[in-house]
Amino acid sequence: MHFAFGCLHVPVADGCEVQVSMADDQPAWVTVVRGDSGLQLQAFAAPKRDGLWAEVRQEIAAEVAKAGGQSEEADGPFGVEVHARIAPPEPVPGMPGGLHPVRFLGVDGPRWFLRGVISGPAALRPEIAAPLEQVFADVVVVRGDHPVPPRDMLEIRLPAEALQALADEAEAQEENRWGGLEPFQRGPEITETR
């Protein structure tokens, strides 16, 4: 069974939680969380003839170095990947300060490119990474037939159940907004006498 997030169909894995991160009120990436580790997923349009992963690896290495981190290429279960140590944009609860390990995975498909980022203990320990690697291997990218410029992110959409849950949550927040007060009902009055 897979959860359909538009272009990404993400498998349901035991012990994993699936989260969708938003940017500018739009779904930006899907993260599969297992324990203290995570796998961030994004799919991009790619040219018909060439893949993107070789170029993207070089760009990742340059960005990591520019941010004061370290990176190196290594062979992994999906081919060449980038092992990096980066400073998180903000402190991570329960993690020591300094550079944190991450693994960048990439797969070129027909007119699409799938990028995965493994973080947390799974970035260093293969036995912890194995379930997340299996999720990455089982992701289905639905490119669609419409034209999308190379390197543009393919559209991630929330499943209908998630949209309904968000609508229900927004409605509950609106109902609780006044904390039990009726905004159009007269409240306590104070009279000043001089």
Residue ranges and their predicted role:
Residues 1-5, 11-100, 112-114, 160-164, ...:
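Conserved polar/disulfide-associated segments of primarily extracytoplasmic proteins
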Residues 49, 71-76, 117-121, 145-151, ...:
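Short C-terminal domain-edge/linker segments immediately following a structured domain
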Residues 64-66, 137-139, 150, 172-173:
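Short, intrinsically disordered/low-complexity patches at protein termini
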Residues 81, 148-184:
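Short, highly charged C-terminal tails/helix-capping segments
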Residues 101-106:
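Hydrophobic/aromatic beta-strand elements that line small-molecule binding cavities or substrate pockets
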Residues 107-120:
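Short acidic, glycine/tyrosine-flanked loop/strand segments centered on an H-E-D-like triad
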Residues 117-163:
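Surface-exposed amphipathic alpha-helical segments
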